[in-house]
């Protein structure tokens, strides 16, 4: 390549460290346009997108009239997603969101790309989902995945700093942890097994061994739902903490979510710019305390305001729908904890309220801007006899849950935990409209390809 064998190869994201230098970058052509003696290539390399400028007179000067002209014409006709090794000088570009560009002095085609299906024109969602393996290359999807990666990194950082141990819960289980019928069943050497809906029960066992633990893995729900908030396969972060009250758990939940937002703001400003996310709102969620209200308060508020708002009437004892959650969180303008739900609509393992028989000690965290529940948590029931009764009441097998009941027989202590849905958190922090774009290859009702 023009004899420049000793030129350093860098990544686009590191352009700010090489302004004025001649470097090489292995990239793909995301888009291009040309006019007369100049061509503009939008380049991507997996770390970022930026512009490469090709000026015909520079190629003629470097390679001669005939070779330079031929090379320039070849570049003008390169197709979308052609893989290239480009050499050039990094320059600042105040007009772009990224802030830098390259004056290209040489280009070598590494891999051809013919008839790339996702063109710069508009495509329908089904078409893009059928080509998800290619759609991931687009600037928006790339930005969302960078934020997702940052949230995962920040999750490990937060819990490591807080003294948690990560444990791995099984994906195949012999029982339904939540006592639900929304299960994917498979054959396990002649006996039924299920894809796990939660790692929580195993995390509780871990908390009794290590004090503070968290699980992080895929979970599965056979929900026949087509809403913008639901996937059939998604990832959950589920901490459990021994000798921890629910109020203490709420403090940890708030600190954790704020840590995620702060980390994205600090380390992923470029993706947020690409996504045009309102970072002033994210800053607000970090700086202001989260709101805490009871389920009773929420029902009273919804009933009081229903005449002036577009959501269905709700009675005490009913669970909230998406419009209810949207109104509540927007009413307060910050992430909002709703505490102490009726026990009839919550899971069997939650601790009963000390002064009320009709509610349990729990909370859901509702994200603002219509993003809904992103965390569910509770203090766990610790009394063996009570939990045994709840297992029977929910129609669960005492034999299958005997190991879980054992945790209440051998040194039972107050403990609390929660679960955060990774994709819901990604959708909220990126300001995206649909959860399907918050995971590389979404699994939804009628969607298992690619």
Swiss-Prot record:
Entry EC number(s): 6.1.1.22
GO-annotated cellular components: cytoplasm
Catalytic reaction(s) noted: tRNA(Asn) + L-asparagine + ATP = L-asparaginyl-tRNA(Asn) + AMP + diphosphate + H(+)
GO BP terms: asparaginyl-tRNA aminoacylation
Gene3D superfamilies: Bira Bifunctional Protein, Domain 2, Nucleic acid-binding proteins
InterPro entries on file: Aa-tRNA-synt_II (IPR004364), aa-tRNA-synth_II (IPR006195), aa-tRNA-synth_II/BPL/LPL (IPR045864), Asn-tRNA-ligase (IPR004522), Asp/Asn-tRNA-synth_IIb (IPR002312), NA-bd_OB-fold (IPR012340), NA-bd_OB_tRNA (IPR004365)
Localization, UniProt: Cytoplasm
Main location: cytoplasm
NCBIfam families: asnS (TIGR00457), PRK03932.1 (NF003037)
Listed HAMAP family: Asn_tRNA_synth
Subunit-structure text: Homodimer.
Family, per entry: Belongs to the class-II aminoacyl-tRNA synthetase family.
Protein name (record): Asparagine--tRNA ligase
Taxonomic source organism: Enterococcus faecalis (strain ATCC 700802 / V583)
Gene of this entry: asnS
């Amino acid at each position: 390549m023009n004899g420049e064998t000793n030129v350093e190869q860098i990544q686009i994201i590191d352009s700010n460290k090489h302004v004025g230098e001649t470097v090489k970058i292995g990239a793909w052509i995301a888009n291009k346009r040309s006019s007369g003696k100049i061509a503009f290539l939008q380049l991507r390399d997996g770390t970022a997108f930026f512009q490469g400028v090709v000026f015909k007179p520079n190629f003629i000067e470097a390679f001669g009239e005939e070779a330079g002209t031929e090379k320039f014409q070849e570049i003008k006709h390169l197709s979308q997603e052609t893989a290239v090794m480009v050499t050039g000088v990094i320059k600042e570009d105040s007009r772009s969101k990224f802030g830098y560009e390259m004056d290209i002095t040489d280009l070598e085609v590494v891999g051809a790309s013919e008839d790339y299906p996702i063109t710069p024109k508009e495509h329908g969602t089904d078409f893009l989902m059928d080509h998800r393996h290619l759609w991931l290359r687009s600037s928006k999807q790339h930005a969302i995945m960078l934020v997702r990666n940052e949230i995962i990194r920040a999750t490990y950082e937060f819990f490591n700093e807080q003294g948690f141990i990560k444990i791995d819960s099984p994906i195949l289980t012999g029982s339904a942890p939540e006592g639900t019928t929304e299960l994917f069943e498979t054959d396990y050497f002649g006996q039924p097994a299920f894809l796990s809906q939660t790692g929580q029960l195993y995390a509780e066992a871990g908390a009794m061994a290590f004090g503070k633990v968290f699980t992080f893995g895929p979970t599965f729900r056979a929900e026949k739902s087509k809403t913008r908030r639901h996937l059939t396969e998604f990832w959950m972060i589920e901490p459990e903490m021994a000798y921890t009250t629910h109020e203490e758990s709420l403090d940890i939940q708030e600190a954790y979510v704020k840590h995620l937002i702060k980390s994205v703001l600090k380390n992923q400003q470029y993706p947020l710019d690409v996504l045009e996310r309102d970072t002033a709102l994210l800053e607000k969620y970090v700086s202001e305390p989260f709101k805490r209200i009871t389920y009773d308060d929420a029902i009273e508020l919804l009933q009081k305001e229903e005449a002036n708002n577009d959501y269905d009437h709700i009675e005490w004892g009913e669970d909230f729908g998406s419009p209810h959650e949207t109104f509540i969180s927007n009413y307060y303008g910050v992430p909002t904890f709703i505490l102490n739900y009726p026990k009839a609509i919550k899971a069997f393992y939650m601790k009963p309220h000390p002064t009320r028989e009709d509610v349990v000690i729990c909370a859901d965290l509702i994200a603002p801007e219509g993003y809904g529940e992103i965390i569910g948590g509770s203090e766990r029931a610790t009394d063996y006899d009570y939990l045994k009764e709840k297992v029977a009441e929910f129609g669960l097998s005492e034999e299958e849950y005997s190991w879980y009941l054992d945790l209440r027989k051998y040194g039972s202590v107050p403990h609390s935990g929660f679960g955060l849905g990774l994709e819901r958190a990604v959708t909220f922090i990126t300001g995206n409209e649909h959860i399907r774009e918050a995971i590389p290859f979404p699994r939804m009702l009628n969607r298992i390809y690619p």
